[in-house]
Swiss-Prot record:
Source species: Cupriavidus pinatubonensis (strain JMP 134 / LMG 1197)
SUPFAM superfamilies named among the record's database cross-references: Translational machinery components (SSF53137)
Signal peptide location: none
Keyword Ribonucleoprotein: yes
Protein name stated in the entry: Large ribosomal subunit protein uL18
Disulfide bonds: none
A Gene Ontology term for the protein's cellular component: cytosolic large ribosomal subunit
GO annotation terms (biological process): translation
Subunit-level organization: Part of the 50S ribosomal subunit; part of the 5S rRNA/L5/L18/L25 subcomplex. Contacts the 5S and 23S rRNAs.
Length: 118
């Protein structure tokens, strides 16, 4: 089992547990150049809010690359604002098998500070 397969296995387990809880899900996806966040509905089929470092508005706030903890903080605040505008206050955090460290942790902390509960 390689590194990617192990991450996907962990992600599958997490998503199965979140699906049992029947709550909205905040999902994070991390690449070498960007970080993406989406809030899915309780059934998991509808995207209620999304934010990423690939968005023009976010790139204007950043001075440089989108693959930093500072960029993840901006995305975390933005996803929390969009989720609250869509009427979502409480979510389950789905780290998609990534370690809760660095950019993933920065995004989660910023979303919590901006008012999302998880």
């Amino acid at each position: 089992m390689n590194k990617k397969d192990a991450r996907l296995r962990r992600a599958r387990q997490t998503r199965a547990k979140i699906a049992e809880m029947k709550v909205n899900r905040l999902t994070v996806f991390r690449t070498n150049s960007h970080i993406y966040a989406q809030v899915f509905s309780e059934c998991g089929t509808k995207v209620l809010a999304s934010a990423s470092t690939a968005e023009v508005e976010v790139r204007k706030e950043l001075d440089g690359k989108g693959a930093t903890a500072a960029a993840a903080t901006v995305v975390g605040k933005r996803i929390a604002e969009k989720a609250k505008a869509a009427g979502v206050e409480t979510v389950a955090f789905d780290r998609a098998g990534f370690r809760f460290h660095g950019r993933v942790k920065a995004l989660a902390d910023a979303a919590r500070e901006a008012g999302l509960k998880f």
